Design a protein with these regions (language model features):
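Iron-sulfur (Fe-S) cluster-binding modules
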Residues: 1-30, 37-42, 46-112, 419
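N-terminal amphipathic alpha-helix/helix-capping segment at the start of soluble metabolic enzymes
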Residues: 5, 86-132, 139, 254-260, ...
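Active-site pocket-lining/capping segments in soluble small-molecule metabolic enzymes
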Residues: 108-113, 222, 236-259, 269-274, ...
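Active-site mouth loops of central-metabolism enzymes
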Residues: 110, 129-144, 188-200, 264-279, ...
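Active-site-adjacent beta->alpha loops and helix N-cap segments on the catalytic face
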Residues: 117, 141-143, 168-180, 198-204, ...
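Hydrophobic faces of well-ordered beta-strands that scaffold small-molecule active sites
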Residues: 130-136, 158-162, 188-192, 217-219, ...
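Short, acidic/polar
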Residues: 139-152, 174, 200-206, 276-286, ...
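Catalytic cores of alpha/beta
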Residues: 199-211, 278-288, 311, 334-339, ...
Length: 419
């Protein structure tokens, strides 16, 4: 009876989704469970111009929340308990059964525990790094393609991201593709998505990955699955968001160090094109406090926007290591360009559209990418993350080969402090 009355009232007042562990008092009286992904700490990286990634005709719930209240960088909300869904939150409040998932929880400061990876060492030593993204194939046969790529690029990159179900399309897991990368003496960056994991499963799989030899991990909320109806439904809420994943792994660092002799290097995603920019920056600070040690951005197509975002990100932290790696798209086919334009959270600048309208666009597209890369280098980027969208192998290799020399030239022109 109490639940039915509460449901009736709160649905009318707050569009309540009956999670049973109400956080309205912490979210400016806006129900965060109206996020289709069910995020307790948002927004996700797919937000552009304040709109929802899943339902773009709607405003992003978390953008509304974060503009109405100050984000506490050193706390987070844990994933809600499923057993409390569709129960009376007032009863749960009195009983205390929702305490951990209702109240903001403090993050754990494990920043004194050094990560075990070579990528971490290079970044904290302020070496310029080049990382490359290789999508995991759908089947094991596709690993032959990964092998061919690694034979070409192994001596040109510091690490290789291997994806898991990129864009929500089923594929081999990142850890499987990464075995090919590791065999060539290159450190992989393993991806885990909150869309796919409850916390116990995440920690179990991450520990298994460390035992294989992996040290770098990118923890992402994840994209909406293409075959799932778009709407707000308890059944499609994601088990975890990226902040919760980072917090969970960060809380285990001391145990990993003492028991395994390994400390993972935790990374996250960021989006310089989410607006208002202050929310994007504050959320990245939140992830940093929770334990993220590095960040790879969404594809950068407008260096000026990146510069403004990065300056805001670095404000007051000028003496700290530079740990943000902007992603540079190499676009070599019209079909792949269309894919880029449809990716959640990716802003495609008019300058790239003009290049892709040319009859013979591959060389101009490569020169455009060189210009973007040099611009972000001049503004203090820790490195570049290369994403291929249909560019021929020889042009990818040219880009990777020239990155370090171009970085030296870009930094020599820069007014940015490198000390």
């Amino acid at each position: 009876m109490i639940y039915q009355i509460e449901k009736l009232i709160k649905e009318k007042l707050f569009d309540c989704k009956s999670c049973g562990q109400c956080v309205l008092s912490h979210t400016a009286m806006i129900c965060p469970m109206n996020c289709p992904k069910g995020l307790r700490n948002g927004p996700c990286g797919g937000t552009l111009e304040g709109r929802c990634e899943v339902l773009p005709d709607r405003d992003c719930v978390w953008m509304q929340i974060d503009q109405k209240r100050e984000i506490a960088p050193d706390t987070l909300h844990l994933a809600p308990k499923k057993e409390l869904f569709n129960t009376a939150s007032y009863v749960n409040l009195v009983k205390g059964s929702d305490r951990r998932t209702r109240l903001p929880q403090p993050v754990v400061d494990a920043s004194h525990i050094a990560a075990s990876s070579e990528l971490a060492r290079k970044m904290y030593d302020q070496e310029f790094v080049v990382t490359l993204e290789i999508p995991s194939p759908r089947t094991a046969d596709g690993l032959k393609r990964v092998e061919r790529i690694m034979r070409r690029v192994a001596d040109k990159v510091d690490a290789v991201n291997t994806t898991t179900n990129a864009g929500g399309v089923p594929s081999l897991h990142s850890t499987e593709t990464a075995k090919v990368v590791l065999a060539h003496g290159v450190e992989p960056v393993i991806q885990f998505c909150g869309r796919d994991h409850e916390e116990p499963e995440l920690l179990e799989e991450l520990e298994a990955a460390m035992e294989i030899g992996y040290r770098n991990f990118l923890l992402l909320t994840g994209d909406w699955l293409p075959d799932v109806d778009r709407g707000v439904d308890q059944q499609t809420w994601f088990p975890m968001d990226s902040l919760q994943m980072i917090h969970a792994v960060n809380g285990k660092l001391e145990d990993y160090r003492d028991r395994l002799g390994i400390v993972p290097f935790i990374g996250c995603a960021s989006n310089p094109f989410s607006t208002p920019t202050t929310v994007s920056v504050q959320r990245l600070h939140n992830k940093r406090h929770a334990g993220a040690r590095f960040s790879q951005t969404q594809a950068i197509t407008n260096p000026a926007a990146f510069s403004d975002w990065y300056a805001l990100l670095r404000k007051g932290r000028e003496d700290e290591p530079k740990l943000a790696i902007p992603s540079i798209p190499l676009v070599g086919s019209q079909r792949a360009f269309e894919v880029l334009c449809r990716l959640p959270g990716v802003f495609v600048d008019a300058s790239l559209h003009r290049v892709m309208e040319m009859e013979d666009f591959q060389r101009p597209s490569l020169e455009w990418a060189f210009k973007v890369a040099e611009d972000v280098m001049e503004h203090g980027a820790a490195g570049v993350h290369v994403m291929n969208f249909g560019m021929p192998a020889e042009l990818i290799d040219e880009f990777l080969t020239e990155m370090r020399d171009r970085n030296v030239r870009a930094r020599s022109r820069s007014e940015y402090s490198w000390t």
